[in-house]
Amino acid sequence: MSRLRWLTAGESHGPALVATLEGLPAGVPITTDMVADHLARRRLGYGRGARMKFERDEVTFLGGVRHGLTLGSPVAIMVGNTEWPKWEQVMAADPVDPAILADLARNAPLTRPRPGHADLAGMQKYGFDEARPILERASARETAARVALGAVARSYLKETAGIEIVSHVVELAAAKAPYGVYPTPADVEKLDADPVRCLDADASKAMVAEIDQAHKDGDTLGGVVEVLAYDVPVGLGSHVHWDRRLDARLAAALMGIQAIKGVEVGDGFELARVPGSKAHDEIVQTADGVRRTTGRSGGTEGGLTTGELLRVRAAMKPIATVPRALATIDVATGEATKAHHQRSDVCAVPAAGIVAEAMVALVLADAVAEKFGGDSVPETRRNVRSYLDNLVVR
């Protein structure tokens, strides 16, 4: 059973996004600057669209935090939308005079659904005759709220269990970074300074070249991000039920990110291509205790963390808003046409890594709270230490 609960609300061009996180203990350090720093990281990356140049995330805590520390009550965060004045009438909650709306170009019905987006299926499911009510919520803008919550979860993980999370881009279109090179928390500043958040300089240049070519071609690109969690204790998650397995929870959280179409834990799909003798992590006794000789499993076995480096990958498809517009129909006329196009990114894979960090942080925070409990950070910290000091097999 989950210990933490989180929800987000709001639309892409609404006044703000709102996020709530329930279940954290008192005493987790968090400030608006800490949240804003991670939101700024979400805007990073070569190939982003025009919105990233002027989008600013105005962070306000609405509850659950006092003087930089959580209170043990639900944490509520608002991420303001600096573009709201342009959309105040189009996205108004209360009715607006139809005559006013008729004169607004932004309010034109979006009747040409975009392939790869939620537009058409959402219109059919909810009974809308245009895509605006669907795309506003389906937009990846919503991930800003999850990154905000992830900032709180990260602080909780570091304060209670010493867990730190890093991501990097390992593939972007045909360009790939060398396999098996894992950044550490000490590399975050260097990663964030790289245009595509790739640790390998040669691979980074190749990725930038891929983005430049896609821009010239009027196309978009996807890629693969890898998230690593350091100092994760053994025993998070459980083997006893399918929905308590940590790898299942991680996969679900990552698949819930817009445009993510595949997830693997550890060596994932590669393990299906090798014999069992080369697929598993052998166990040895070392001066530091019981360890695995390799990290093929990605730090989980049987739904539980092993105490080794936790490693997951997520594959992001190319952005569906393609500049050269894909074929669709106009639902108002039934005629064949080209999909609606608005400003968009050529590539958002580097930003997807930041969102993936947030989702991994939230899942791990839930697992830590589930395993160790505690109504305050010191209590949870004591519980973690006691557990690790008293492991039967160490």
Curated annotation (Swiss-Prot):
Co-factor: note: Reduced FMN (FMNH(2)).
Pathway membership: Metabolic intermediate biosynthesis; chorismate biosynthesis; chorismate from D-erythrose 4-phosphate and phosphoenolpyruvate: step 7/7
Pfam families named in the record: Chorismate_synt
InterPro entries: Chorismate_synth (IPR000453), Chorismate_synth_AroC_sf (IPR035904), Chorismate_synthase_CS (IPR020541)
Protein's GO biological process: amino acid biosynthetic process; aromatic amino acid family biosynthetic process; chorismate biosynthetic process
Gene Ontology CC terms: cytosol
EC number: 4.2.3.5
Keywords: Amino-acid biosynthesis, Aromatic amino acid biosynthesis, FAD, Flavoprotein, FMN, Lyase, NADP
Cofactor dependence: FMNH2
Superkingdom in the source lineage: Bacteria
Functional note: This reaction introduces a second double bond into the aromatic ring system.
Protein name as it appears in the record: Chorismate synthase
